[in-house]
């Protein structure tokens, strides 16, 4: 819906607050990168602000900049001064953990908000589709953004992912234990992506639950790399085989429909939700025709929101 058909999805208050805290942590890391390069200014292309190194130590200033930027970008999300203060407390808590152990300013920062776009040139990952008068072909790509990469020396790097929410598997409602995090798809795919980008480097993966459990660190190996690729292969083949997508809940009674998804909204006075309308369109016309009619072909392979990055949604349907 969002990536192939250009419908704009919902951002909820907790998610937006998490993005704000991520932005504060990113700026602290950007300060360290600037210092390593001998610079005295941090240029933030996202917010358009240039900050001195001294300003980068002002956590309240960073929080206010991030809060104002993202609330202006998402005016439909109603958060105010109470949430502004909460975001600041989260950032303060994050950098205070174990006497500043996870404060980016105390680390050797290799990169912040590192974007990856990995094309998997394997026979199983090849695709070819006909749309209107175009042929779209290539290989499956995975795209994303890593919060922070730390240089631990001797060719060893640590991928660090921040989480402000609960330590739950939202698909099952169960707590993510260390054992479950060892098989966490997001963390495995981070490892897979970075090993593709930097094959000569070694990576560990850490996830820091600021408000629910602290730091968990995993060391992956070649077997985990292969597991990650197998996850991708199975998901790709599953998606490719679908001709008639199923709704999570036909009547939108599932909690994800109620709390997380904007597509339950009515589609153009049709008496149907957006997802119901598209379901019926696919049933009548087929997937290809629906993508041709509703989609933006030039947007299908582009990256949306990630980390502090905002998608260009000028063509998105509200």
Protein language model regions, located:
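C-terminal, charged and often intrinsically disordered regions of DNA end-processing helicases
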Residues: 1-15, 306, 310-318
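Short amphipathic alpha-helical segments and their helix-coil junctions
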Residues: 1-8, 73-74, 165-172, 234-243
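Short, hydrophobic/amphipathic alpha-helical patches that form generic packing surfaces
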Residues: 1-3, 19-30, 191-192, 263
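Short, polar/flexible loop-turn hinges at active-site or ligand-entry regions and domain interfaces
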Residues: 5-13, 32-37, 77, 173-176
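Hydrophobic (often cysteine-bearing) scaffold residues that line and stabilize catalytic clefts
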Residues: 13, 17, 21, 83, ...
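A non-catalytic, helix-rich entry segment at domain boundaries
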Residues: 24-127
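Mg2+/Mn2+-dependent nuclease catalytic core
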Residues: 116-234
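Metal-dependent nuclease catalytic regions and adjoining charged, substrate-binding loops involved
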Residues: 179-184, 189-318
């Amino acid at each position: 819906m969002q990536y192939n058909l250009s419908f704009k999805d919902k951002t909820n208050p907790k998610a937006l607050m998490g993005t704000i805290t991520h932005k504060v942590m990113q700026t602290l890391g950007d300060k360290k990168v600037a210092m390593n390069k001998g610079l005295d200014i941090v240029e933030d292309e996202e917010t358009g602000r240039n900050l001195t190194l001294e300003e980068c130590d002002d956590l309240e200033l960073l929080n206010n900049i991030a809060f104002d930027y993202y609330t202006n970008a998402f005016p439909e999300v109603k958060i105010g001064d109470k949430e502004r203060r909460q975001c600041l407390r989260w950032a303060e808590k994050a950098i205070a953990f174990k006497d500043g152990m996870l404060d980016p300013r105390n680390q050797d920062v290799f990169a912040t908000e590192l974007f990856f776009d990995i094309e998997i040139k394997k026979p199983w990952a090849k695709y070819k589709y006909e749309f209107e008068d175009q042929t779209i072909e290539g290989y499956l790509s995975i795209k994303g953004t890593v919060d922070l990469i730390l240089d631990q020396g001797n060719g060893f790097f640590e991928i660090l992912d921040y989480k402000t929410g609960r330590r739950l598997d939202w698909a099952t409602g169960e707590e993510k234990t260390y054992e479950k995090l060892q098989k966490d798809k997001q963390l495995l795919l981070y490892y897979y992506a970075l090993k593709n980008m930097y094959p000569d480097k070694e990576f560990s993966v850490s996830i820091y639950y600021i408000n629910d459990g602290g730091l968990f660190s995993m060391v992956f190996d070649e077997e985990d790399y292969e597991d990650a690729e197998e996850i991708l292969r199975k998901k790709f083949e599953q998606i490719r085989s679908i001709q008639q997508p199923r709704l999570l809940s036909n009547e939108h009674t599932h909690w994800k429909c109620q709390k997380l998804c904007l597509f339950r909204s009515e589609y153009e006075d049709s008496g149907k939700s957006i997802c119901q309308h598209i379901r019926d369109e696919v049933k009548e016309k087929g997937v290809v025709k629906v993508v041709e009619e509703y989609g933006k072909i030039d947007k299908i392979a582009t990256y949306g929101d990630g980390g502090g990055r905002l998608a260009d949604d000028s063509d998105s349907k509200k």
